[in-house]
Regions:
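ATP-dependent NMP and nucleoside kinases share a basic, alpha-helical "lid"
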Residues: 95-99, 126-127, 131-164
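Walker A/P-loop
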Residues: 15
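Well-ordered beta-strand positions
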Residues: 27, 33, 150, 195-197
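The conserved Walker
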Residues: 10
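Small-molecule kinase domains that catalyze NTP-dependent phosphoryl transfer to phosphate-bearing small molecules
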Residues: 140-146, 166-219
């Protein structure tokens, strides 16, 4: 089975590409959503988060994202600590997803690795067995990168990314700060030994679909 990572800097549109893959009935694990589920359900992870960020970081449904975001954007060492806490749990969940029985019952686009085996690739007859993981910054999680055969990088012009973030409700300054914080984090050279493919997403759905279908054709 081929294991492919989908990544891209903030505002590039990796989630849109993941959505298109789900529409084609591919199995895609949303790593960001999985992390939120772990924040909510994993007792051990919640304890580690509280030990470092304080009990105030926890909520009944997960964590106080605003509090944590303020810490990690102001302090690079806090971001590194967060990654060291979270990534081992996420890596285990992704491993379960990749190794789940392809014929097991589940929902193909679920972020829950316990039920992520899904319904297969019925709408893509001829495409070899493949599963996708969508994540923001694979380069900061070497253990995840090691699992992957290919990495598809979704990119967009910086002005387009800035506009998308502002449309989500961020101030222009905050959006620019977040873009700067991730600058270079999805560069192809950060993934030596992996087949790299780039999908440009400037907002034209038909062009994104065309690029995606070309990549899927190679998998047949």
């Amino acid at each position: 089975m081929l294991k492919i990572g989908i990544t891209g800097s903030i505002g590039a549109g990796k989630s849109f590409v993941g959505k298109l893959l789900r529409e084609r009935n591919f199995q895609v694990l949303d790593a960001d959503r999985m992390v939120h589920e772990l924040y909510r359900d994993c007792v051990e992870l919640r304890a580690e988060m509280a030990a470092f960020f304080g009990e105030a970081c926890l909520t009944p449904t997960g964590v106080n994202s605003a509090l944590i975001a303020d810490r990690i954007f102001a302090d690079a060492s806090a971001r590194e600590k967060l990654e060291k806490i979270v990534y081992p749990y996420l890596t285990r969940a992704v491993d379960v997803f990749f190794n789940a029985d392809a014929n097991a019952t589940g929902v193909a686009n679920s972020a829950d690795a316990k039920g992520a085996a899904g319904a297969g690739n019925a709408t893509n007859a001829g495409v070899k067995s493949v599963r996708f993981v969508e994540a923001a910054l694979f380069s900061r999680a070497p253990s995840l990168v090691e699992m992957l055969d290919e990495i598809w990088i979704v990119d967009a012009p910086e002005r387009v990314r800035l506009q998308r973030l502002v449309a989500r409700g961020l101030s222009e300054n905050d959006a620019a700060r977040r873009i700067e914080n991730q600058r270079g984090a999805c560069a192809p050279e950060l993934f030596p030994g992996k087949r790299i493919c780039t999908i440009m997403n400037d907002g034209d759905r038909s062009q994104v679909e065309s690029q995606l279908d070309d990549l899927l054709e190679v998998l047949k």
